Amino acid sequence: MIILGIDPSLVSTGWGVISISDSMVNYIDSGVIKTVSKDSLVLKLGNISLMIEKLITRFNPFHVAMEEVFINKNYSSSVTLIQARGAIMSVIGRYNIDFSEYAPNKIKKAIVGAGKAEKHQVQQMVKLLMHIKKAISKDESDALATAYTASVNQQIKII
């Protein structure tokens, strides 16, 4: 079973692909979708949508998992994050792929064992659990952690 994990952002959306077989988690690939700062919001959202669609057609995931939004004091950044998530979710819906979302503290707890873990701890555990030797960004590790959380969550039934 292939799971695509997504750490949404208008600037740098992290993505990670894992496979689950015989209760083993295997790292397949990961990366970051970067947008151009001078582009309009519409162009940025269009680019994110297009790249997510390319990932879906390339990896054909059984399930997509995404980090939930938490509303912070900076209202405008929260709104743009929600818009990025909407663009991503519309692609997932178009392909009718099984979908789940997880709060950041639930993801941290699944990976590190503590909901208040630091980003570098998540990054280290992702690399350890998935036997990743290369350097990965925090956006990639967050996306892979989200995919991992989906793999251990009981909502996903392996057929």
UniProtKB/Swiss-Prot annotation:
The keyword Cell inner membrane does not apply. It comes from the Bacteria. Its main location: cytoplasm. The lineage of its organism: Bacteria, Pseudomonadati, Pseudomonadota, Alphaproteobacteria, Rickettsiales. The active site is at D7, E67, D139. InterPro entries: RNaseH-like_sf, RNaseH_sf, X-over_junc_endoDNase_RuvC. It is found in: Cytoplasm. Mg(2+) 1 binds at D7, D139. This is Crossover junction endodeoxyribonuclease RuvC. The RuvA-RuvB-RuvC complex processes Holliday junction (HJ) DNA during genetic recombination and DNA repair. Endonuclease that resolves HJ intermediates. Cleaves cruciform DNA by making single-stranded nicks across the HJ at symmetrical positions within the homologous arms, yielding a 5'-phosphate and a 3'-hydroxyl group; requires a central core of homology in the junction. The consensus cleavage sequence is 5'-(A/T)TT(C/G)-3'. Cleavage occurs on the 3'-side of the TT dinucleotide at the point of strand exchange. The keyword Ribosomal protein does not apply. It catalyses: Endonucleolytic cleavage at a junction such as a reciprocal single-stranded crossover between two homologous DNA duplexes (Holliday junction). GO terms for cellular component: cytoplasm; Holliday junction resolvase complex. Its cofactor is Mg(2+). CDD domains: RuvC. It comes from Orientia tsutsugamushi (strain Boryong). Homodimer which binds Holliday junction (HJ) DNA. The HJ becomes 2-fold symmetrical on binding to RuvC with unstacked arms; it has a different conformation from HJ DNA in complex with RuvA. In the full resolvosome a probable DNA-RuvA(4)-RuvB(12)-RuvC(2) complex forms which resolves the HJ. GO terms for biological process: DNA recombination; DNA repair.
